[in-house]
Amino acid sequence: MTDDSTTGQGEDARFSPLPARPGKIVAIHLSYASRSDQRGRRPAHPSYFFKPSSSLAPSGGTIERPAGTELLAFEGEVALVVGTAARRVSPEAAWDHIASVTAANDFGLYDLRANDKGSNVRSKGGDGFTPLGPELIDARSVDPAALRVRVWVNGELRQDDTTAGLLFPFAQVIADLSQHFTLEPGDVILTGTPAGSSVVVPGDVVEVEVDAPGAPGAPSSGRLVTTVTQGEHGFDGSLGSLPAVDDTQRAEAWGSREAAGLDPEPEPFVLTPALRAKLERTPVAGISAQLRKRGLNNVSIDGVRPMHPEAKVVGTARTLRFVPNREDLFRSHGGGYNAQKRAFDAVGEGEVIVIEA
């Protein structure tokens, strides 16, 4: 963000329209059903990360996509501004501690996401990565379950959802956070983004609006406007990790493999009931003979026996390969929750784990 202007009162314009610079900005990873369905996972509980207050920006500013990066994505969100201190409050009393709501854009740079491992310090903490405003809506005047958030990119509607689709109501989020630390006046809570988030490029104009169309007067935040520009500065690999992307990151940033210009994933093999029944009737020696006829001489299953003589195991196989213990790779490969444990946890009905040691 390049806008360092100040208001007529000598205040930093980055924090307009907030009453003061917030002590903390707390953001939620996944909170909308539509976004969770798009990602293919639904969290049982909310999880959070912090954003620095230096990432705030006013409406009408710009955001730089750093040199050497490609996956800057927008996320339109409802922002809650804390009015009175909240510590260990109940869900029933939680909304009373919110002074106002407004629009926010939780920009993120997917090129740095893997390096942050969920903390989002670098991928979402850059200057100008949290535009907010332009107007505050009195929290007393709206139903927190009936707010709408919309996003336009170059005038085209890209996100459109309401807080009725939240997995975790605002009251739960406020109460949950307050049991861990004090929410102080001026703190900002970014409440997550619905489906539709995608990548923007230099020259794009992103607009976010939060409103309450069913409330008296249909109060609105107005449109929060941000223009994407190309930054001149990249990152120094001698100081820290460099941006890195793969097709998985591209698909998540754009919203789908198709939107990212990638080939679709191949259709997974399906072991149908008819094929399972046929395999159960086929002698093991016969299957091995068929494999050899196809030139697969090193995958014979002759001699494989179930622990129970009357049983016959038929399923889709996954291979779990054990390698020599490498302490230096322990942390980078999942730490205590390593590939072995993940494989055993993920096995489902009709699947077989083949252990190669």
Set out the residue ranges of the language-model regions.
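Short, structured patches in soluble enzyme cores that scaffold and shape functional sites
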Residues: 51, 76-78, 82-84, 102-107, ...
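Extended, compositionally biased flexible segments
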Residues: 1-77, 226, 251, 257, ...
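Catalytic-pocket segment enriched in acidic/His residues
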Residues: 2-18, 35, 41, 110-268
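Short gly/pro-enriched beta-turn/loop segments at secondary-structure junctions
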Residues: 20-21, 73-76, 95-98, 116, ...
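Extended boundary segments
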Residues: 27-32, 106-107, 124-163, 289-318, ...
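Generic secondary-structure signature for well-ordered alpha-helical cores
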Residues: 54, 85-87, 103, 137, ...
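N-terminal accessory regions of nucleic-acid-interacting proteins
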Residues: 87-101
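Short acidic/polar capping segments at secondary-structure boundaries
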Residues: 31-33, 54-56, 84-87, 104-110, ...
